[in-house]
Regions:
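Non-catalytic interaction regions
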Residues: 1-499
Length: 499
């Protein structure tokens, strides 16, 4: 007979063997369900039918506006200690008004229509290469784009821009800027022939002709080159060169006035200032364009800067009202200002799709090179004099004292450097030493189908999530900050000793 419990109901007593067998069987069933294969179609259908959980943290829409430069932000991106609930403040764009630059110029209707065409955006890098006045020197890995995932622009090694002479050497075909001025009767055929070894499906001669006419009419660099080439046709004319100035005025996005970007120089060019670009009439030797030159970007990306708007220069300054003198505008501040949507402002740069990806990679290499140049020029500030150098030498096991002092010291502040990685490794071990081993190892993955990203991209035609990596990064950063707050302040997993 089954005994009765305290409530009077009969209860069954389980043996230890039965309890162990039951729990073991349930574990086996759970493991078998976890190991059950999931097909791609089944996973995709489950993702489409899935709706956000009631506890899903939605960052809202990007509707907040910076009071200084009209940049668009999410409310969660505000600077908390200087913001109010009804008046958020931001500084990722213009550093609270200290970075002041005019808005981009409105492009011609022809270019605006092309940037709304999905077919054009798919091949925008090819079209830009056709009209680029400098060559893009880098090892671009195109084999990773096999059609099974989003488009990725990946470069190995250094990036450099090269510019040649105004006229091509004898028995050679024109390339890059030479196509604007040499053999103009066959310009369209020359540009298409330049990409004869690539897949030309979708390259439209009509689009090439339209872009050529537009750039010749509005781009100041093209005007300088065309005026110089007219002197080439004069028999017995004096030798000359083209000088592209480095000392630009402190302004951006203004339409370059004639004569402000460069000039034709006759005879000696010894008075050229540092980093000026000197182009000779017929000289087959290509020269490397310095990243410090304001023409570095507009010469390479004429479709993003159709008027020839100049880029960053060391002569640019921030506007600090309470400072005795203006501080220099860093490369990082300049490009951070550029890649923000602004209320009521049309930006070709942000609608560039795959070309925008290439521009971001190019801009990041400029930022990293600027940091490396600063470190190289201030080695004495980063070394703890002789003691640090000796300690590093002993740590490496060097016995030859002649090698001490000949290496470049990369401090821990340089992102990705050996000391940077070692410092973070030591910080992680220090936390474990004080608080013990971690109880949770949590991974946090970004989903490009998050509602915030999808809603923002729906405002712009023909763009995919991979075309705006800046938006993906910003939304992911907000989610990470909110998740950490969810763990630490809400104590979801209990009291947090370290995180």
């Amino acid at each position: 007979m089954i005994p009765r419990g305290a409530s009077g109901k009969r209860r069954r007593e389980f043996s230890t063997y039965e309890i162990g067998e039951s729990s073991h069987s349930s574990r086996l069933r759970r493991v078998s369900r976890m190991l059950e294969p999931v097909t791609c179609a089944r996973y995709a259908s489950s993702q489409e039918e899935r709706t956000p959980l009631p506890t899903y943290f939605d960052c809202g829409d990007c509707v907040c506006v910076c009071q200084y430069c009209s940049a668009m932000f999410w409310f969660a991106e505000r600077v908390v200690h200087i913001s109010r609930s009804n008046h958020p403040r931001y500084n990722q764009c213009c550093k609270s008004g200290t970075v002041a630059m005019p808005f981009p110029l409105q492009p011609p209707p022809v270019i605006k229509q092309l940037f709304d065409d999905s077919g054009f955006l798919e091949r925008i890098r090819l079209y830009n290469s056709m009209f680029a006045m400098t060559s893009f020197g880098a090892d671009v890995e195109e084999n990773i784009n096999d059609g099974r995932g989003p488009y990725v622009f990946k470069v190995s090694g250094q990036i450099s821009h090269w510019i040649g002479s105004l006229c091509p050497p004898p028995n050679e075909k024109p390339r890059f800027l030479q196509m604007y001025v040499y053999d103009t009767q066959n310009e369209i055929a020359n540009r298409l022939r330049f990409f004869a070894g690539t897949d030309q499906n979708g390259l439209s001669p009509a689009i090439v002709s339209s872009l050529s006419d537009t750039l010749k009419s509005i781009n100041e660099y093209v005007r300088v080159f065309k005026n110089a080439f007219e002197l080439c046709d004069i028999e017995g004319g004096p030798d000359f060169s083209i000088r592209l100035y480095n000392n630009v005025p402190d302004r951006r996005y203004d339409a370059p006035a004639p004569g402000t970007l460069g000039a034709i120089v006759h005879g000696d060019d010894s008075n050229a200032s540092t980093y000026d670009i000197i182009l000779h009439k017929k000289n087959g030797t290509a020269q490397r364009v310095s990243k410090l030159h304001p023409s570095y970007m507009p010469l390479q990306y004429p479709l993003l800067f159709p008027f020839g708007e100049q880029g960053w220069s060391p002569r640019l300054h921030r506007r600090l009202p309470n400072a005795s003198r203006d501080k220099n505008l860093t490369v990082n501040m300049y490009y951070s200002y550029q890649i923000h949507d602004r209320a009521g402002v049309y930006s070709l740069l942000l609608k560039g799709g795959r070309l925008f990806q290439q521009y971001l990679v190019d801009a990041y290499t400029c930022i990293e090179q600027s940091r490396l140049d600063y470190i190289n020029a201030n080695q004495n500030l980063f070394r703890s004099e002789y003691v640090a150098g000796m300690y590093d030498a002993l740590s490496r096991g060097d016995t030859d004292s002649r090698s001490i002092g000949k290496r470049i010291f990369l401090p821990s502040s340089f992102t990705g450097g050996p000391r940077y990685m070692y410092k973070h490794y030591q910080d992680a071990l220090a936390i474990c030493r004080v608080h013990g081993n971690p109880q949770y190892f949590i991974t946090f993955t970004c989903n490009v189908k998050w509602p915030e990203i999808a809603r923002h991209l729906n405002k712009v035609n023909c763009l995919h999530a991979e075309d705006r990596p800046d938006i993906i990064s910003r939304v992911f950063q907000m989610k990470v900050i909110e998740f950490v707050k969810f763990m630490k302040e809400d104590k979801t997993f209990g009291d947090v000793a370290a995180c």
